[in-house]
Design a protein with these regions (language model features):
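MFS-fold secondary transporters
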Residues: 1, 15, 91, 205-206, ...
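Helix-loop junctions on the cytosolic side of multi-pass membrane transporters
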Residues: 80-106, 296-302
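Juxtamembrane intracellular "pre-TM" segments in multi-pass secondary transporters
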Residues: 95-131
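Substrate-agnostic recognition of the 12-TM MFS/MFS-like secondary transporter fold
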Residues: 7-69, 80-87, 92-95, 128-149, ...
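Helix-loop junctions at membrane interfaces in 12-TM secondary transporters
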Residues: 1-12, 205-218
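Membrane-interface helix caps of multi-pass secondary transporters
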Residues: 149-155
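Juxtamembrane helix-start motifs in multi-pass secondary transporters
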Residues: 76, 187-194, 279
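Structural signature of the two symmetry-related core transmembrane helices
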Residues: 190-205
Length: 302
C-alpha cells in the first residue's frame, strides 16, 4: 500500500523481527511434542517433511510470483500477505508441550547468555554441531545468492531463471522429504564427513565449470542442503534439554546468519573484481576446513 524504499525497509525489519521470534521455537515444539508422546525417533522424518513443504512452497511461489509480477510488481506482495494472515489462527491452535512448564528459564538477558555459553563453550558436541551448521549454512546461503549471477554468466535466458530456481528448491525438498532414510543412529557423524567432502568437491568443480554443465554441481549442493538440515537439527535436539532447546536452535540460526553476513560482502567483492570462480574456490576452502574439522571432532566425541 506504500511505495518507496523506506516503507520497504521498514517491512523488511518487521519481517526480520517476526522471523527471529519464531527462530528455534517451531523445531523445539515439534521435538518436545514427540518426546512427550515417546515418538522422538520420528523427528527427522517430520522435520524433513516440514522443511520439504517449505521448499516445495518456495518452488511454486517462484513460478506463480513471476506470473503475478507481470500484472503488477505489488501483486505478489498482496497474495503473500493474504497467505501469511492464516499463520495467525494456525499459531493460536498450537498446544505447548507440558514439559515446557518444568524447569523454566528466567526471561532475562543473563539467562539467555547462560544458554549461549552452554551451547558455545560448555557443551563440546553442541559447539561443533553449530560450527558445522555455520559452515554448511554459509555454503547454501552463498549458493542461493550466487545462483542467478552464475545463470547469467553461462548464458541462461532470463525467462528460465524462475524455472531453474523452482527446480533447485524442489530438488532440496525431495532430499529433505527423505532425509530420515540417511539418519541412522551411530552413523551420523561419520556421514557428516562425506557430506562435507561432497559439498567441498561440488564448489571446486563448479569453479572449474564456467558452462551450463556447472548447473549439475549447483543441483548437487541443493540436494545436500535438503539432507543435512533436518539431520543437524535432530542432532542438536538430542544434545540439549527442553528448557534450552528453542534458544540453542536460535543461537545456531543466529551464528549461521552472522557468518554469512561476514562472508557475503567479501565473496561479493571477489566475484565482482576477480571472478565468480574465485568466490567458489574460497567457499570450498571455508566449507571444507570448518565442516571437516567439526565432523572429525564430533566423530571423536561420539
Amino acid at each position: 500500500f506504500y511505495g518507496g524504499f523506506y516503507a520497504f525497509a521498514i517491512a523488511q525489519v518487521l519481517i526480520g523481527i517476526g522471523g527471529s521470534l519464531m527462530s528455534g521455537s517451531d523445531s523445539a515444539i515439534i521435538y518436545d511434542t514427540l518426546l512427550e508422546t515417546n515418538n522422538k525417533t520420528s523427528y527427522t522424518k517430520i522435520e524433513g517433511r516440514s522443511y520439504a513443504i517449505g521448499n516445495f512452497s518456495e518452488a511454486l511461489a517462484g513460478i506463480l510470483g513471476g506470473f503475478l509480477a507481470v500484472g503488477s510488481i505489488y501483486l505478489p506482495i498482496y497474495v503473500q500477505t493474504s497467505i501469511l494472515f492464516f499463520s495467525i489462527p494456525i499459531a493460536l491452535t498450537l498446544v505447548e508441550p507440558t514439559m515446557h512448564e518444568e524447569n523454566k528459564l528466567d526471561r532475562s538477558f543473563s539467562a539467555i547468555m547462560g544458554v549461549v555459553r552452554f551451547a558455545i563453550l560448555d557443551n563440546a558436541k553442541l559447539r561443533w554441531l553449530i560450527i558445522y551448521s555455520s559452515a554448511m549454512g554459509v555454503a547454501t546461503l552463498s549458493m542461493a545468492w550466487f545462483a542467478q549471477p552464475f545463470f547469467n554468466q553461462v548464458g541462461v535466458p532470463l525467462a528460465y531463471f524462475g524455472i531453474l530456481w523452482a527446480g533447485l528448491n524442489f530438488s532440496a525438498g525431495l532430499t529433505s522429504f527423505n532425509a530420515h532414510k540417511f539418519d541412522k543412529k551411530g552413523r551420523n557423524y561419520s556421514m557428516l564427513i562425506y557430506l562435507s567432502l561432497a559439498m567441498f568437491i561440488s564448489f571446486i568443480l563448479l569453479g572449474f565449470n564456467n558452462s551450463l554443465f556447472g548447473l549439475i554441481f549447483i543441483l548437487i549442493i541443493y540436494l545436500l542442503r535438503g539432507i543435512v538440515t533436518p539431520i543437524l537439527r535432530n542432532e542438536i535436539n538430542i544434545n540439549t534439554t527442553s528448557n534450552k532447546r528453542a534458544t540453542v536452535l536460535s543461537v545456531r540460526s543466529f551464528i549461521i546468519r552472522i557468518s554469512f553476513a561476514i562472508c557475503a560482502p567479501i565473496l561479493g567483492y571477489i566475484a565482482e573484481n576477480y571472478s565468480l570462480a574465485s568466490s567458489f574456490y574460497i567457499l570450498a576452502i571455508i566449507v571444507g576446513l570448518f565442516s571437516l574439522l567439526a565432523s572429525f571432532r564430533l566423530s571423536k566425541l561420539d
